[in-house]
Amino acid sequence: MGMRMMFVVFLLVVLASTVVSSTSGRRAFHGRNAAAKASGLVSLTDRRPECCSDPRCNSSHPELCGGRR
């Protein structure tokens, strides 16, 4: 292999590793975000009776009380 060909292969390897690392980082971020949303929903579910009796909370979180009243 010539020097140009080795340089092109090197650039392709660097480009491929950069693309893989940037996309895997985004997936991890979305995973953390989804986990935080799920955690928030679990904490709201624990307070379901209080939330369903409060009109402001009920309108903000209709999924807890079975829809809008």
UniProtKB/Swiss-Prot annotation:
Belongs to the conotoxin A superfamily. Residues 1-21 form the signal peptide. Disulfide bonds join 51-57, 52-65. Residues 53-55 are annotated as: Ser-Xaa-Pro motif, crucial for potent interaction with nAChR. GO terms for cellular component: extracellular region; host cell postsynaptic membrane. Residues 22-49 form a propeptide. The modification Glycine amide is found at residue 66. GO terms for molecular function: acetylcholine receptor inhibitor activity; ion channel regulator activity; toxin activity. Pfam families: Toxin_8. Keywords: Acetylcholine receptor inhibiting toxin, Amidation, Disulfide bond, Ion channel impairing toxin, Neurotoxin, Postsynaptic neurotoxin, Secreted, Signal, Toxin. Expressed by the venom duct. PROSITE patterns: ALPHA_CONOTOXIN. It is found in: Secreted. The cysteine framework is I (CC-C-C). Alpha4/7 pattern. This is Alpha-conotoxin-like Tx1. It comes from Conus textile (Cloth-of-gold cone). Alpha-conotoxins act on postsynaptic membranes, they bind to the nicotinic acetylcholine receptors (nAChR) and thus inhibit them.
